[in-house]
UniProtKB/Swiss-Prot annotation:
Keywords: Electron transport, Membrane, Mitochondrion, Mitochondrion inner membrane, NAD, Respiratory chain, Translocase, Transmembrane, Transmembrane helix, Transport, Ubiquinone. Core subunit of respiratory chain NADH dehydrogenase (Complex I) which is composed of 45 different subunits. It is a multi-pass membrane protein. It comes from Eulemur coronatus. The keyword NAD applies. This is NADH-ubiquinone oxidoreductase chain 4L. Its main location: mitochondrion. It is found in: Mitochondrion inner membrane.
């Protein structure tokens, strides 16, 4: 496995670990999720270019579209939670909490 792919996989794992460790704030979770999507985009683009998958050239673009939609929904949720509660804790999103 080339060193570029290894570094990108390590970046994905680091973002995943950051998502698991720093899950109390919504902003840090969104940043880690964006890092995961960016590393997935770069890895899929490199894989398609290196293996000459001519039929799969649209996959990285679709991944970017879903990442943009995820970022927009996440930021809208962050603004709503911040305006409602004054904090960006994920525990404020629990609907079962009284």
């Amino acid at each position: 496995m080339p060193s570029i792919s290894t570094n990108i996989i390590l970046a994905f794992i680091t973002a995943l670990l950051g998502m698991l460790i720093f899950r109390s704030h919504l902003m840090s979770s969104l940043l880690c999720l964006e890092g995961m999507m960016l590393s997935m985009f770069i890895l899929s683009t490199l894989t398609i270019l290196n293996l000459y998958f001519t039929t799969s050239f649209m996959m990285p673009i679709l991944l970017l579209v879903f990442a943009a939609c995820e970022a927009a929904v996440g930021l809208a949720l962050l603004v709503t939670v911040s305006n409602t509660y004054g904090l960006d804790y994920i525990q404020n999103l629990n609907l079962l909490q009284c």
